[in-house]
Amino acid sequence: MPQQYPLPVFHFTVQWGGTRIGFSEVSGLTQENQAIEYRDGSFPEYSSIKMPGLRKFSNVTLKRGVVAADNEFFNWLSTIRLNKVERRDVVIALLNEEHAPVMVWKIHNAFPVKVEGPQLKASGNEVAIESIELAHEGLELQND
């Protein structure tokens, strides 16, 4: 039987529209269920009951190094108009040492809500990093 071990976070891929794009960081792969509190006046207990409510998904943030002449983030953000938005499905895969996906997050109907350029500093010695924040309508996890 193969030994089970925790997966490292540094080996992953991100794809949208069939294109694989390199990112240095992904965050916000969060899903939660809201709790609904309810109490009927005839309940013998003096407390409310709780039931599951609507699912809620946090925005996903993707960060990568700035590449000259690559304006993909800003171009996608600029396509948003009133009642018109270009939505994309995004696939994030955590890979094993053979570069095969072992966990896959599928983000449905994503669109950009924020694009942030790099922080510029005259005394800095880092790579320029840009980020895009995506709102979406669902998060699906596949764990092979």
Say what each PLM segment does.
Residues 1-144:
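Glycine-rich, low-complexity intrinsically disordered segments
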